[in-house]
């Protein structure tokens, strides 16, 4: 695994001058910034993977860090110019660490929402998606109510890849209504026009709704910013087949993530 990650490192940093000058998706920082961020994250991943071989008693924590940092690598590479196959590989190579980091005492909702949303956007295989379904089902059964609420938004996304007779219906409310009720409203829209309106309304408020997130305003801090991408909004749009043409240039909406099939080079 270390080799695979370093292979990614070599492929990016060994790229030609012409490739270095290609435009990137993010509009707030340049390629050099993201290369620095990538180096920082890959170094962290390799460090914690090495710890995993020698310090088993902290396995849970190390697995969680590797899983989280790998999602950040996907974010960084998408902010640059990463394509479907590369991002899929990073996702699937890190999925086992995310699963091994299961902790019913301290679940982190945003990490789980990002992992599920990206699983949908990156078209991961059904057997891997079922691992996410089982993970959240287990969390719903084992986590203490004070720490965790079976969540309507997570299950809307998870159910989108399940057959009708497999869909779960036990979630009754949103775990984070302030942040998520606008997005859940999209899923309940009466028709495609209402869904698009609700989607546009929500993406317009998305950044400010996340002002308590650790990444908020991270572009103002040194070597912290990996991109502002609303993966969960794009995942809902994809599941619902919403015409998102008007959002193509929205700075928070990862349009390419929803439209890999239309990219002939992928």
Residue ranges and their predicted role:
Residues 7-15:
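Short, aromatic- and cysteine-enriched interfacial helices/patches
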